[in-house]
Amino acid sequence: MKNNQSKIKLVIDVGNSYLKIGVFHDLELIELKKFKTKYFKISYFENFYKKVFAKYKFNLFIVFGSVVPSIEQKFLDFVKENNLENNFFLINNYLKLSFKVPQEKLGLIGNDLLGAMEYASKETSNALIFLFGTASVALLLEKLNFSGAIIAPGMNFSFNNLLSKAKKLKGFKLHKENVSLWNLNTQDALESGYENLKNGFIKQIICKSNSNYPVYISGGDISNLSPEISHQFVDNIVLKGYLLIYLKNC
């Protein structure tokens, strides 16, 4: 691992909803591929791997992080079958990080949360980090310590579940544009509900945290985020954090 000279890294983030593969040249994300996790087959990755290898003519190094054990095992089998052990790095709770995790919590924290925290800790000692995906997550970084998390059902997941159970809402899609607070029809009322859930989740946590820490947001749709919320949007923060964890340990 220490002698790996490949400039091209395939960084893989396996989440509950999506599996993302980022192609990085040094620290720059130059290509992104995304699959729905529930339908993923290892042959999809094998084909993508071959295409990237043919395109960039570099030995490829794989950085892998997952919150789905069954998918992780498929990749471990692929690596073993193709003799790629020396070009593979597995994210876990026991690696060197740029922030501290309580000893008693090691092994209990999702790898995706570690990735997001690593990214933020490279920029600041204190931060509030919000991740919007299958779950809505808030993370607290204080003095380069992982101080806690809040996890709620993901908003897209919750709304899709609502829509699936309401017969009159079949085919409805959230547009999330120019949303008024109060509305007189179901579609606009749902749009408002979605936006207020999102803004309320963020604003309430910032308020209760009683801090002026920098706010990082990743995932989901933030097109109508309240202008009162000063924040930095970081696309694919987990992928970028996984790469930083690898670089700290190589």
Curated annotation (Swiss-Prot):
The record, for InterPro entries, names:
ATPase_NBD (IPR043129), Type_III_PanK (IPR004619)
Q: Where in the cell is it found?
A: Cytoplasm
Asked whether the UniProt record includes Transmembrane helix among its keywords, one would answer no
According to its UniProt record, which cofactors does this protein need? NH4(+); K(+)
**Which reaction(s) does the protein catalyse, per the Swiss-Prot or TrEMBL entry?**
(R)-pantothenate + ATP = (R)-4'-phosphopantothenate + ADP + H(+)
One short Pfam name that applies is Pan_kinase
Q: Name one GO molecular function term.
A: pantothenate kinase activity
SUPFAM superfamilies per UniProt: Actin-like ATPase domain (SSF53067)
Pathway, per UniProt?
Cofactor biosynthesis; coenzyme A biosynthesis; CoA from (R)-pantothenate: step 1/5
Alphabetically sorted, this entry's keywords are: ATP-binding, Coenzyme A biosynthesis, Cytoplasm, Kinase, Nucleotide-binding, Potassium, Transferase
Give the EC number(s) listed in the UniProt record.
2.7.1.33
Which coarse location class describes where this protein primarily resides? cytoplasm
* Cofactor binding description: A monovalent cation. Ammonium or potassium.
> What GO biological process terms are annotated to this protein in UniProt?
coenzyme A biosynthetic process
- Binding of substrate: at which residues? G110, N111, D112, L113, T186
UniProt family annotation:
Belongs to the type III pantothenate kinase family.
| Self-association and partners | Homodimer.
What the entry lists under HAMAP family is as follows: Pantothen_kinase_3
Q: What is this protein called?
A: Type III pantothenate kinase
**Organism per entry:** Mycoplasmopsis synoviae (strain 53)
Per the record, the gene is: coaX
